Amino acid sequence: MSAISNNPDKEKALNLVLNQIERNFGKGAIMRLGDAAQMKVATIPSGALTLDQAMGGGFPRGRIVEIYGPESSGKTTVALHAIAEVQKAGGVAAFIDAEHALDPTYSAALGVDIENLLVAQPDNGESALEIADQLVRSAAVDLIVIDSVAALVPRAEIEGEMGDVQVGLQARLMSKALRKIAGNMGRSGCTVIFLNQLRQKIGISYGNPEVTTGGTALKFYASVRLDIRRIQTLKKGSEGEFGIRAKVKVAKNKVAPPFRIAEFDIIFGKGISRVGCMLDLAEQTGVITRKGAWYSYEGDNIAQGRDNAVKYLEENPDVAAIVTQKVRENLDMSSMGFGDEHHTTEEE
């Protein structure tokens, strides 16, 4: 082996071909694995600190993300919060509304800058994915949300008769589009979030009968897959329901350890409760302690019951800011945010 590696002619030929490949295909097209043992992956905050922690910092930049779950589980809310975070940091975001169901009022309530949000409402799946591909290739857009995979109806299906049997059209469309999009994302740094619905497999008597729409290509191309579920309806006395408790399982993660769990509250009309997320992590890290129903900070009781503790922190933003900083430091997330980088040794 040493005789081969010390051959100067082979080393010279190797350097020549590596330089030629980089000239033809760009810097980083080929490299020695040891030169990039730790891959730098910038992240986009999700708007929920608990979810950021579960994903290893946030949504990875330049990657494909899939968020799937039942109806009214919080998929669109999470995506809109990510858009708001990108815009707050001065980035550009696009929303491809294949379902034609985007609510501008709700989006604005979540912090989305409606005036500067790029929105497309294409008539068919080919148009939607072509728009996404062109935005990715432009390298001028930081985040694209596609809502949803189930609504990406192929043109042939739209133009055909209602009774026509067309097998696998959408799966083939997704497979072809993802091949194009994935090849351009690494160079542009654009993140694409696909929202997806669940269906039931017919005739399944054992195992999980749930399956996502659009075939299997998205499962392979996605660096992160999030399974989001509504686990509780939030109620307050005579006021009735005011939100839901959502649980997210990181079903796949190529840039951080997978299978982590995150929970957070989604308040109707307001979105993710940031203070609620921070309180949960503060209790988890010991920044805030709970004995029975009482929550304490630095030895002083601040509230009885979780709702009152959240209210206290909302009414005392200075305390909330200090607690948030301590939580981030304890979780080693103090530098995480839009454009920041963390490291992974995951082999793609």
Curated annotation (Swiss-Prot):
Lineage: Bacteria, Bacillati, Cyanobacteriota, Cyanophyceae, Oscillatoriophycideae
Keyword match Coiled coil: no
Record family assignment: Belongs to the RecA family.
Gene Ontology biological process terms from the UniProt entry: DNA recombination; DNA repair; SOS response
Location, primary (coarse class): cytoplasm
Function: Can catalyze the hydrolysis of ATP in the presence of single-stranded DNA, the ATP-dependent uptake of single-stranded DNA by duplex DNA, and the ATP-dependent hybridization of homologous single-stranded DNAs. It interacts with LexA causing its activation and leading to its autocatalytic cleavage.
Record-level Gene Ontology MF annotations: ATP binding; ATP hydrolysis activity; ATP-dependent DNA damage sensor activity; damaged DNA binding; single-stranded DNA binding
PANTHER family reported for this sequence: MITOCHONDRIAL DNA REPAIR PROTEIN RECA HOMOLOG-RELATED, RECA
PROSITE patterns, per the entry: RECA_1 (PS00321), RECA_2 (PS50162), RECA_3 (PS50163)
List of residues binding ATP: 69-76
Organism: Picosynechococcus sp. (strain ATCC 27264 / PCC 7002 / PR-6) (Agmenellum quadruplicatum)
InterPro entries: AAA+_ATPase, DNA_recomb/repair_RecA, DNA_recomb/repair_RecA_CS, P-loop_NTPase, RecA-like_C, RecA-like_N, RecA_ATP-bd, RecA_C_sf
Subcellular location: Cytoplasm
Name by which UniProt lists this protein: Protein RecA
Keywords, ordered alphabetically: ATP-binding, Cytoplasm, DNA damage, DNA recombination, DNA repair, DNA-binding, Nucleotide-binding, SOS response
Entries under CDD domains matching the protein: RecA
UniProt key word Ribosomal protein: no
Tree of life domain: Bacteria
GO cellular component: cytosol
